[in-house]
Amino acid sequence: TSVSMTINGPAPIILACFFNTAIDQQMAKFEHDNGRQPTEDEAEKIREWTLKTVRGTVQADILKEDQGQNTCIFSTEFSLKVMGDIAEWFVHHDVRNFYSVSISGYHIAEAGANPISQLAFTLSNGFTFVEAYLARGMHIDDFAPNLSFFFSNGMDPEYTVIGRVARRIWAVAMKNKYGANERSQKLKYHIQ
C-alpha cells in the first residue's frame, strides 16, 4: 500500500501521525500474532522495519504554494527549514520508500504557466530544495531519491516531451553539478 498526501502547512504533524499509526498497527499485529507485547528490542526493530517499509508521498511543496496558489501560511524560509527537517528526519531514520516532497508544477500551470515555464519553475524549485538540504549538511544521495515531481498535462505539443526533458535536465545536473549517484539522478514524476 502506498499513501499519498497533498498537504502543505500541516505536513510535519500529519506525517508524524501517519508514521506513528503505521508503527502502532505493526505493534498491534505483533501482539495479536504472539499473544504478548513486544520487548523493548523487538519494539525498536518493529519501528525500524516499519519506517523502512512504509510507502507514500507528501506533496508539501511550499514553493508552488507561493508561485501557483499564493496561499502560504509560513514564510518561504521557515517552510524550507521545516521541509529540510522532514528530509533530515527521513535520512536519520532510514525512510527510503516515502517521498518527502513532491515538487509540483501542476499548480504553477493551473496559475497560467505554459508547459515550458511550468517545467522551468518546477525544476528550479527542485534545485532550490536540493541546495537548501545541502546547505544543512545532508549528502545528495541521502535525500535526492526521496524527491518526486508532479506535472500537468495538456494538448500543447510540449506536453508530449515534458517528462523526458525534465528527466534529462535533472540527471545531467545531479551527476555533473552535485556528483549524485545513479539512483539520485532519476527524476520520478506523475502527470495529471
List the model feature ranges, each with a label.
Residues 170:
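Conserved, mostly hydrophobic/aromatic
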Residues 1-153, 158-162, 177-192:
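Catalytic alpha/beta active-site cores
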